[in-house]
């Protein structure tokens, strides 16, 4: 009997999975809410990169919603896509969006080069848009003939990137935006798009029930083929039959359980309850720290012709602007997802690569203030000296991240510079401060400081040179 008990105990200790029943998710919100909506891995990862790349990269005009704008003869749009399309390509009766597919060759696409760029940029999770509103799947699909393996590049883009990204130790991300496909373009008779053979591309000419099934089948196919660690969904999930949405989520979570995989699903406007998924804030973040960790997706594109997909002559954000957004987002309990915009041939413009490389360079030096951190009791403050500072913490360290250099000009200053932080004081800091150090210098020397119940102040010696033109980090270590 003792031998039998010992054997059972051995299996319980050594193989705990045998003694613990796996979750079996049902397609209802109560059951789905048992899922851990925000696992610790993404709270540690903090920074990811994804890419809007698809058929819309061929016309490369206005933005990634080209399929919608080209069909809108009442378009008041700032760039007149409809009239331009007619002038360049001909009437909609003879040239449809589907005619761009053979032009979408991706002849220079290299998944390893993409993944190397993501690593160089400091990303901890990464991946492609699997399908945008236009109905063209970027993976090898049996659900729709309009996919990148059978048409266009003739390659499984999602699959190649999954392999390259995981090989480099990153979590695999992908996004699905096809919930808008059915209402995105209301196809009219007389358009080339009205040909029944294009129904699964444009969506709106399908029976609604058939389209709903296709939406679900695409989601299931992506889950089963690529097992993403995180699937991002755009807005408009209310357009999807809720039974099908819950069926998909239950399948995703159950498949993850089989693989001992901690997965995440995101949505906007709580289209998926925040007890089930992670909330995404597009190009924005809360004004203060919020309890639920969130995702902020942020595009490198900016300016008048704001676009997530590549457009000719597009303006992009600087590395400073992106890093400042990352710092703010992290200080408020968020994670930043940066979008890049590759060309139709599968290459990244040099200016985008340069920005990503500079982001990675900053994170290489100051990343300890970002990765694996959690918010401090307050996200930051504007000092009386006019400095914007954000706070994060990890272990026994608190990080004060300044968006501009609080010290003096080394070529002009004759005095030391004193910095006062009202939100850091002996009441807000739980513990005794041991030291303060300015990161990024070859020789990291302790910074003189004082602390009382009202503020912390520290002195930057006049000969101290700023270690970064982007943002400076002071590490405050507790005993």
Spans of features found by a protein language model:
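Bacterial Sec-dependent N-terminal signal peptides
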Residues: 1-22
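Mature catalytic domains of secreted/periplasmic carbohydrate-active enzymes
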Residues: 20-479
């Amino acid at each position: 009997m003792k031998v039998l008990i010992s054997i059972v105990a051995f299996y319980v200790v050594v193989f705990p999975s045998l003694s613990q029943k796996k979750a079996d998710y049902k397609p209802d919100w109560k059951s789905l809410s048992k899922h851990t909506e925000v696992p610790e891995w993404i709270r540690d990862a903090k920074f990811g990169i994804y890419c809007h790349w698809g058929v819309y990269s061929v016309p490369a005009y206005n933005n990634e919603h080209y399929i919608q704008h080209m069909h809108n003869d009442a378009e008041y749009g700032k760039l007149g896509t409809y009239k331009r399309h007619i002038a360049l390509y001909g009437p909609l009766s003879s040239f449809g969006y589907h005619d761009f597919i053979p032009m979408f060759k991706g002849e220079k696409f290299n998944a390893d080069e993409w993944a190397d760029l993501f690593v160089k940029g400091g990303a901890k999770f990464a991946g492609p848009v699997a399908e945008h509103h236009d109905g063209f799947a970027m993976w090898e699909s049996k659900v729709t003939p309009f996919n990148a393996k059978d048409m266009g590049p003739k390659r499984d883009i999602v699959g190649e990137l999954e392999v390259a990204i995981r090989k480099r130790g990153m979590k695999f991300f992908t996004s699905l935006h096809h919930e808008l496909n059915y209402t995105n373009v209301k196809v009219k008779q007389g358009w080339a798009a009205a040909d029944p053979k294009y129904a699964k591309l444009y969506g709106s000419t399908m029976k609604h029930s058939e389209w709903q099934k296709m939406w679900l089948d695409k989601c299931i196919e992506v889950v089963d083929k690529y097992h993403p660690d995180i699937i991002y969904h755009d807005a408009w999930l209310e357009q999807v039959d809720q039974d099908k949405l819950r069926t998909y989520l239950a399948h995703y979570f159950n498949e993850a359980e089989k693989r001992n995989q901690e997965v995440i699903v995101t949505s906007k406007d709580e289209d998926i309850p925040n007890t089930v998924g992670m909330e995404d804030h597009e190009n924005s973040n809360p004004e203060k720290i919020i309890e639920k960790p969130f995702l902020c997706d942020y595009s490198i594109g900016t300016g008048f012709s704001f676009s997530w997909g590549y457009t000719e002559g597009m303006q992009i954000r600087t590395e400073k602007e992106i890093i400042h957004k990352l710092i703010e987002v992290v200080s408020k309990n968020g994670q930043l997802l940066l979008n890049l915009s590759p060309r139709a041939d599968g290459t990244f413009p040099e200016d985008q690569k340069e920005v990503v490389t500079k982001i990675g360079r900053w994170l290489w030096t100051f990343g300890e203030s970002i990765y694996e951190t959690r918010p401090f009791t307050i996200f930051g403050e504007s000092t009386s000296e006019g400095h914007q500072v954000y706070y994060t913490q990890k272990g026994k360290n608190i990080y004060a991240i300044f968006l501009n250099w609080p010290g003096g000009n080394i070529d002009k200053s004759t005095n030391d510079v004193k910095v006062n932080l009202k939100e850091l004081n002996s009441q807000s800091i739980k513990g005794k401060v041991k030291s303060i150090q300015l990161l990024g210098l070859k020789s990291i020397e302790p910074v003189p400081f004082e602390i009382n119940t009202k503020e912390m102040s520290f002195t930057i010696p006049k000969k101290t040179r700023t270690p970064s033109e982007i943002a400076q980090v002071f590490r405050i270590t507790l005993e």
